[in-house]
């Protein structure tokens, strides 16, 4: 298309050294050498000597040149140390087989049994996400790594080789799902049990102890069983002729711990706490068993004087009249005697100190309830006779005597007020209004 001019031959400069190896020859790179004169490139070479002398090996001769490879890091053949043409990996495999054939081993060699190829029912879909599978199926498939099949030349145990592919991939997936479900159920059960234990420990303990012995059931009865036992106890006790006090004393004789009549009464009427009733129920059941089987138990109970464990109530104290008069005289002198004075009064009257002390306490409470005050507690001086009320006229501001000495009071009346009557006109049509206290006279005139 265009006529290109021919350039004259280019002469080399003596300071330039040609590249004999063709390392930097632009003509070797396709598409870069457009003209024939660009087939050889020259580079300036410095002839300056180093300050430290001749550096051996730095001067390059034409015979020592080597090919320059800009991509040496990607040269797999040089890195692996493989020389030759063909596939290098096949050569490696052949060398490995030759080495294994040369090496002799005392262990027997075995090959895995011929197995059918692995078959997977579900094809892998890269577009399907994890959560879409979970939402569609409801369960998460746990992928389980498959065992690596053995090579023909590997050493193995014949028994172990037969156990490699015993289960199919589908079964392994199912086992993974079942294990995940089991762990999920176990964690949910543990969390739910931990939450319900706080609210109903008794029901759970009873439910968990269904397989235990009957003794554990008796230790924690419910309210219905306790109520029925209390009714049976009361019925049998009355039928056999025992009192509640006899039952309490019999428990002391049998088990070394005496209960009062009030405790047995509260148990029969279900007025004790549930915890105390649970503690008392085994003892009462043992007592019923002893009463039904031992006929001499009534004789043992009737001998209450052997070990007086039941404290009897103290009888009411009665004081004679002459002793009461003497105590009244002491009370008039001092309403609150000291401990020494109480002991002296008890010796004089031949009484107990507690009886004298209680009498003085009761007498003081009785005096507080009376209308008139009694002897002063501080000095023992009696009050004067009932005080007479002074009339109000004798005070500093006397009031007028309104109420006379008669039995029925009378209201003093003053003079009648003056009545003013206006002049009477005879020709008036309307009568003159008159006071209420004045008579009307003859109305006919």
Swiss-Prot record:
InterPro entries attached to this UniProt entry = HD, Homeobox_CS, Homeodomain-like_sf, Lambda_DNA-bd_dom_sf, POU, POU_dom, POU_domain_TF
In which tissues or organs does this protein occur?
A: Initially (stage 9) expressed in all regions of the embryo, becoming localized to the ventroposterior regions by early neurula stages. In adults, expressed at a low level in the brain.
Keyword Transferase carried by entry: no
Entry GO MF terms? DNA-binding transcription factor activity, RNA polymerase II-specific; DNA-binding transcription factor binding; RNA polymerase II cis-regulatory region sequence-specific DNA binding; sequence-specific DNA binding
* Pfam families per the UniProt record, alphabetical: Homeodomain, Pou
Summarize subunit and interaction data from the UniProt record for this chain. Answer: Interacts with the transcription factors tcf7l1/tcf3 and vegt.
Q: Which family does it belong to?
A: Belongs to the POU transcription factor family. Class-5 subfamily.
**Record's protein name:** POU domain, class 5, transcription factor 1.2
Lineage, opening ranks: Eukaryota, Metazoa, Chordata, Craniata, Vertebrata
């Amino acid at each position: 298309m265009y006529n290109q001019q021919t350039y004259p031959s280019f002469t080399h400069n003596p300071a330039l050294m040609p590249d004999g190896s063709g390392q930097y020859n632009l003509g070797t790179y396709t598409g870069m050498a457009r003209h024939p004169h660009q087939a050889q490139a020259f580079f300036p070479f410095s002839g300056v000597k180093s300050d430290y002398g001749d550096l051996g090996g730095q001067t390059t001769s034409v015979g020592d040149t080597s090919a320059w490879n800009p991509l040496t890091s990607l040269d797999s053949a040089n890195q692996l140390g493989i020389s030759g043409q063909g596939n290098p990996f096949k050569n490696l495999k052949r060398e490995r087989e030759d080495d294994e054939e040369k090496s002799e081993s005392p262990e027997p060699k075995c090959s895995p049994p011929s197995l059918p190829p692995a078959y997977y029912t579900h094809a892998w879909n890269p577009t399907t996400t994890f959560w879409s599978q979970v939402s569609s199926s409801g369960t998460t498939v746990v992928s389980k790594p498959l065992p690596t099949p053995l090579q023909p030349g590997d050493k193995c145990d014949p028994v172990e080789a037969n156990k490699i592919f015993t289960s199919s991939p589908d079964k392994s997936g199912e086992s993974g799902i079942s294990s995940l479900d089991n762990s999920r159920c176990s964690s949910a059960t543990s969390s739910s049990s931990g939450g319900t234990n706080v609210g109903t420990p008794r029901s759970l303990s009873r439910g968990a102890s269904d397989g235990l012995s009957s003794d554990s059931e008796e230790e924690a009865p419910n309210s219905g069983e306790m109520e029925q036992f209390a009714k049976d106890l009361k019925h049998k006790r009355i039928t056999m002729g025992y009192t509640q006090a006899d039952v309490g004393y019999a428990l002391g004789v049998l088990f070394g711990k005496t209960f009062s009549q009030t405790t047995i009464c509260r148990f029969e009427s279900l007025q004790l706490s549930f915890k105390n009733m649970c503690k008392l129920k085994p003892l009462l059941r043992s007592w019923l068993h002893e009463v039904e089987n031992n006929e001499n138990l009534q004789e043992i109970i009737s001998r209450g004087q052997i070990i007086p464990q039941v404290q009897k109530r103290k009888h009411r104290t009665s004081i004679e009249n002459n002793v009461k008069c003497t105590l009244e005289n002491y009370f008039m002198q001092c309403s609150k005697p000291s401990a020494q004075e109480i002991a002296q009064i008890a010796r004089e009257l031949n009484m107990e100190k507690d009886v004298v002390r209680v009498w003085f306490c009761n007498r003081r409470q009785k005096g507080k309830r009376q209308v008139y005050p009694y002897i002063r507690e501080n000095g023992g001086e009696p009050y004067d006779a009932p005080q007479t009320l002074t009339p109000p006229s004798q005070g500093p501001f006397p009031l007028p005597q309104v109420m006379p000495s008669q039995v029925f009071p009378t209201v003093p009346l003053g003079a009648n007020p003056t009545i003013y009557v206006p002049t009477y006109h005879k020709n008036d049509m309307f009568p003159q209004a008159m006071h209420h206290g004045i008579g009307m006279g003859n109305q006919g005139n």
